[in-house]
Amino acid sequence: NNLNLPFVVHGRSSNTVEKYNWVDVNNERSFFRATQLLIELGHTTIGLINGLADMDFAMRRAQGYRRALKENNIELADAYLTHGEMTEPNGYKNALALLDLPTPPTAVVTSSIIMANGIRRALDDRELKLGRDVSVITHDDDLSYFRDAAAVPVYTATRSSVREAGRLSADLLLKAIADPGRDPEGILLDAELILGSSTK
């Protein structure tokens, strides 16, 4: 970098050739596994309510979703994949759009618990029950103020700890400070797939 200062990035960029230190979740694999689980449960019409389309993590999650569909010979229109800011209102709005499709999805994968809460509100408004009428899998960053820590979690989730990613990032930064000449390192974390009551 121009300032010649050590740094570590949480996440990755697909648009740079310069090597740098990073820690990231294996987003492609996480959303492949989530979509594959829904397919194994018998779902064939699966929506994805994703983050902003130009964000690296969202692109990788869409790739995982599409790969699972392709490997199971499931073809879905582009309308089943939506993008937007990861907010509760966007989760709500995009869920309603999916539910208004001629063949609405029986399952949805989404990028955050905040958006999942919006999906849940949309289901309530349509008098549909989460987990019974529509299955939902969300990504969970394991943030304490959104913790889904019931004995049986509300949401089935791909869970990856932001706290652990922060610890690993700090370790990488200390290594870079101690040895400025060391080659940059990337750490790719696998998310856990946690079963909750939102899938059937």
For the regions a language model picked out, list residue spans one by one.
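Flexible loop/hinge segments that line or gate small-molecule binding clefts
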Residues: 1-33, 114, 140-155
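Residues that mark the start of a beta-strand
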Residues: 4, 45, 106-107
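Conserved beta-strand scaffold positions in the cores of enzyme catalytic domains, especially
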Residues: 7, 20-22, 48, 81, ...
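Hydrophobic beta-strand scaffold residues
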Residues: 7-8, 76, 130
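Hydrophobic alpha-helical segments within soluble ligand-binding/sensing domains
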Residues: 23-48, 63, 88-97, 116, ...
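An alpha-beta-alpha
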Residues: 32-72, 185-198
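Short beta-strand elements in bilobed, periplasmic/extracellular small-molecule ligand-binding domains
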Residues: 48, 66-92
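Flexible loop/turn connectors
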Residues: 96-97, 101-200
